[in-house]
Amino acid sequence: MSDLTTRTAAELAQQIHAREISSVEVTQAHLDRIAEVDGELNAFLHVAGERALEAAAAVDAALAAGEAPASPLAGVPLALKDVFTTTDMPTTCASKILEGWMSPYDATVTTKLRAAGIPILGKTNMDEFAMGSSTENSAYGPTRNPWDTTRIPGGSGGGSAAALASRQAPLAIGTDTGGSIRQPAAVTATVGTKPTYGTVSRYGLVACASSLDQGGPCGRTVLDTALLHEVIAGYDPRDSTSRDVPVPPVVEAARRGAAGDLRGVKVGVVKELHSDSYQPGVLASFDAAVAVLKDLGAEVVEVSCPHFEYGLPSYYLVMPSEVSSNLARFDAMRYGLRVGDDGTHSAEQVMAMTRAAGFGPEVKRRIMIGTYALSAGYYDEYYGQALKVRTLIARDFDRAYEQVDVLVSPTSPFTPWKLGEKVDDPLAMYLSDLCTLPTNLAGHPAMSVPSGLSKDDGMPVGLQIMAPALADDRLYRVGAAYEAARGPIA
């Protein structure tokens, strides 16, 4: 393994911009690493080596001509979750229904990455249409956890997290609907942030649940993640949910936090996200992390968010309802797979045959749940009630932030389980979102930072840090301070 793949993105950027190393060298080193290990891990669905090297060469040429770097991360390659559209690579969402589909336009996030001079190594594996917590729901096979290849890497963005953890990429982009950036980060000992809803454009992000989906940055350090956050965030008039507000100073906050002083910061431990039903090693790691925050000068208090108890059932009504609506567009008429189009079937039959063949079991399950929840006789009883709970959860957050600056919890109640262990028990798998989904329901930012290895099985555990809307910088200050005090993960 080239030592170029072990350096942080910040280190690589500094050395590329100083012309001590070239972007082509760095990109090639990561492509070599992909060729070496991804046959076993299956983190990538598509590798764009030639295009990535062309982008890297363009960065090197610009620097050689005396031009300033296009961004603080210019020349540092990246892995992109296969849910963002790209004109030069297939966008499949890990589904057979979009196998080989080429988008006619780039997502705004893709456009920002290209403008920043960031070579895109390829598109990463995921649960189909971002529905799942293990990356086992991909139509192209599961991704394996680099820490133990018999275990899951989290989901839905397990491909991006596994690529980071295995040194196949120094940076990655994910999406988070109910924890799909943070839970994979936790179980692979990487860093992932779900920004405030509406601060990273969803234009060109294939929708799962539109009121919950949020693209976000992933890295191996808090500073790397902050640098990428500033590249992809910002107002986009093409996204009707985009917020026209300044990007929080997350890089400055990360650098400040690394100094290790949290005096004056109030941290709330959420009572409802600390349960004896959680894995003992997860709780032990979390309690140790809270002790570190106290040692850094933070004031730690317990806070109660009583309606979090209803977060899981509320989420699993809101999200499938939006899925049912969004995925209606895959009708075999406009793009993607088309089955039975031989002139002997009606349009309705072609649509039914295509959806039956093209969608996997979990996607079908959520479409059915959502369609039922939205049906005329049950709308108020199910979907309407879930929206009321969503409002109550947001109010719980508001009351909590009157007392504290940030909230903390374990990222996931469990360490990564064995591949196949929960495939036939979706309810058990849904529980892995227990700690992460409240922030999606409220639209608030949250981050997962590695907090060590579980005493139960030696697998990675994550500390979740949450903040009020548009206070993403608080995540980075606290996360960087904790990261510096915690030291390396074994």
From Swiss-Prot:
Highest taxon above the source species: Bacteria
Active site: 81 (charge relay system), 156 (charge relay system), 180 (acyl-ester intermediate)
Keyword annotations: ATP-binding, Ligase, Nucleotide-binding, Protein biosynthesis
Pfam families: Amidase
EC number: 6.3.5.7
Catalysed conversion reaction: L-glutamyl-tRNA(Gln) + L-glutamine + ATP + H2O = L-glutaminyl-tRNA(Gln) + L-glutamate + ADP + phosphate + H(+)
Gene Ontology MF term list: ATP binding; glutaminyl-tRNA synthase (glutamine-hydrolyzing) activity
InterPro entries: Amidase, Amidase_CS, Amidase_dom, AS_sf, GatA
Any single GO BP term: translation
Name of the top EC class for this enzyme: ligase
GO cellular component, one term: glutamyl-tRNA(Gln) amidotransferase complex
Subunit organization: Heterotrimer of A, B and C subunits.
PANTHER family for this protein: GLUTAMYL-TRNA(GLN) AMIDOTRANSFERASE SUBUNIT A, TRANSAMIDASE
Family as reported in the entry's similarity comment: Belongs to the amidase family. GatA subfamily.
Name listed for the protein in its UniProt record: Glutamyl-tRNA(Gln) amidotransferase subunit A
Gene name as annotated: gatA
